[in-house]
Design a protein with these regions (language model features):
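C-terminal peripheral helix-coil segments that are non-catalytic and often amphipathic
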Residues: 1, 95, 131-142, 156-161, ...
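N-terminal intrinsically disordered/low-complexity leader segments
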Residues: 1-9
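Helix-turn-helix
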Residues: 2, 13, 17, 21-55, ...
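Amphipathic, non-transmembrane alpha-helical scaffold segments
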Residues: 15, 57, 61, 65, ...
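Short coil/turn segments at alpha/beta junctions that flank glycine-rich nucleotide-binding fingerprints
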Residues: 24-28, 79, 100, 143-144
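Hydrophobic alpha-helical connector segments
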Residues: 59, 63, 70-99, 155-158
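Secondary-structure edge/capping motif, primarily at the C-terminal ends of alpha-helices
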Residues: 75, 104, 108-111, 169-172
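Short secondary-structure transition hinges
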Residues: 94-134, 142-143
Length: 196
């Protein structure tokens, strides 16, 4: 049992070190040797847990996506009404995506190289987003807060809006400006579907 714990801690330490270096130097410029050196270990210690640098990047991205999902779930669970759930979903998602795009700014320069991996991970995350939004919408419809409509189509539409906003994150100079834009977007959405 102790060995498993040490194994988990070693793996987590490697992922944490890789994350720091990927953020600082980008994926392309970070080597497995750099990661090992930053930890005071040899390369073979990294390869014991990860067969290559890409699998290490996958672990880093999976960890970040896990944090993103937990943040969104926690925020949505704390909200009491379907309207508030939509609002906190959109705000939390936008702030977390902004945080990630800032922390991993160097990845934008390497996007073409990383596209296949990013696309695969994005597709998994899209399922979570679609299911979460669909659930919020369906509860809102059942409670009579939202007009009855195709929740799947509406969830996809909301995601398109949020992704459009996501593409423009760098144009918002402050978190307050981003919050205001998200609030406007949610208000347009709510007053378009809210039962009067």
């Amino acid at each position: 049992m102790v060995k498993r714990s040490n194994s988990y801690e070693s793996r987590a330490e490697i992922v944490s070190s890789a994350k720091r270096l990927f953020q600082q130097y980008g994926y392309k410029k970070t080597t497995v040797s750099d990661i090992a050196k930053a930890m005071g270990k040899v390369k073979s210690a990294i390869y014991y847990y990860f067969p290559d640098k890409e699998s290490l990047l996958r672990a880093v991205i999976d960890e970040e996506i896990g944090k993103l999902i937990r943040s969104i779930k926690d925020a949505v669970e704390r909200a009491s009404t379907p309207e508030e759930k939509l609002r906190v979903y959109a705000l939390t998602r936008s702030f977390e995506i902004r945080r990630l795009s800032t922390e991993y700014a160097r990845f934008q320069e390497e996007y073409d190289q990383l596209f296949p991996l990013v696309k695969e991970i994005h597709e998994r995350y899209d399922h979570f987003e679609r299911d979460t939004l669909k659930g919020i919408l369906e509860v809102g419809m059942e409670l009579g807060h939202f007009n009855k409509t195709d929740s799947e189509v509406l969830a996809d539409t909301i995601l398109l809006w949020l992704k459009g906003l996501e593409a423009q994150l760098s144009s918002f100079g402050s978190e307050e400006a981003l919050k205001e834009a998200v609030e406007h977007l949610v208000n347009v959405l709510l007053f378009g579907i809210k039962v009067r």
